[in-house]
């Protein structure tokens, strides 16, 4: 097995990270129902956030999809910041986290320490829910509500037959969402470490197996023979 190739092209789907959003779109003066999706996956040892819009009948249209890619350690920290925001925020607010890339010249050479903002990860809270999304320059963004699906009366409190507070429910769902992502990334890092060590083992110089000859004086001419 070529572990170097396996390490460079390591991929893993994370299906539980998918978020969906139905929205109304104006088309020729008529409102039509459209679908947006967000999906987080591991791609070539990094983290990919795919966002698709107008997917109801356009899932296979390339222009409907955008992708944000970041190194696994960077994205791990971003998701940890999102979780911390959810746990600590006490008011309606938004946090914008930039994902940067190295700035390069026309020949592909890095321009010192200069960086460019590739996209922003958005985590926020309104009066009822937490939301999460990605904004890319010149492409806009989509906010996905962090809220479990609620068919029928699934989330009614039996005691008073009243609905559960939507903000509390959203906070629990959002915390669990980022917890699962962080746990999965921990597994990915362990797997990548194992593959990396097989692909690039540390080379240790082997010592000679032939024992050193120890001079114990047996071959010395001591002159004792003449005395004896």
Summary of predicted features, one role per range:
Residues 141-228:
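Mixed-charge, glycine-accented linear interaction segment located at domain edges/termini
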Residues 2-10, 67-96, 167-198:
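DNA replication sliding-clamp ring fold and its partner-interaction surfaces
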Residues 60-67, 116-120, 141-143:
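Short, mixed charged/polar active-site loops
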Residues 31, 48, 55-61, 107-109, ...:
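Short, surface-exposed beta-strand/loop "edge" segments at domain boundaries and coil↔beta transitions
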Residues 93-134, 140:
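Intrinsic, low-complexity N-terminal interaction/targeting segments
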Residues 51-71, 150-167:
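A cross-kingdom feature marking solvent-exposed beta-strand/loop segments within repeated
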């Amino acid at each position: 097995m070529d572990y170097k190739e396996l390490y460079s092209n390591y991929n893993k789907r994370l299906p539980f990270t998918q978020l969906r959003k139905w929205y109304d779109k104006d088309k020729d003066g008529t409102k039509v129902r459209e679908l947006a999706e967000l999906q987080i996956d591991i791609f070539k040892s990094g983290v990919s956030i795919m966002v698709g819009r107008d997917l109801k009948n356009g899932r296979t249209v390339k222009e409907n999809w955008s992708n944000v890619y970041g190194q696994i350690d960077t994205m791990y920290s971003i998701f940890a910041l999102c979780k911390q925001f959810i746990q600590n925020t006490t008011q309606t607010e938004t946090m914008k986290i930039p994902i940067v890339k190295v700035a390069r010249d026309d020949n592909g050479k890095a321009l010192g320490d200069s960086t460019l903002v590739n996209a922003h990860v958005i985590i926020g809270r309104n009066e009822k829910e937490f939301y999460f999304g990605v904004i890319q320059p010149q492409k806009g963004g989509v906010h996905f509500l962090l809220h479990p699906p609620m068919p029928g009366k699934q989330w009614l409190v039996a005691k008073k037959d009243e609905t559960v507070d939507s903000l509390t429910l959203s906070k629990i769902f959002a915390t669990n969402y980022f917890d699962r992502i962080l746990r999965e990334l921990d597994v990915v890092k362990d797997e990548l470490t194992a593959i990396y060590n097989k692909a690039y083992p540390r080379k240790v110089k082997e010592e000679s197996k032939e024992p050193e000859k120890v001079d114990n004086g047996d071959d010395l001419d001591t002159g004792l023979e003449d005395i004896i």
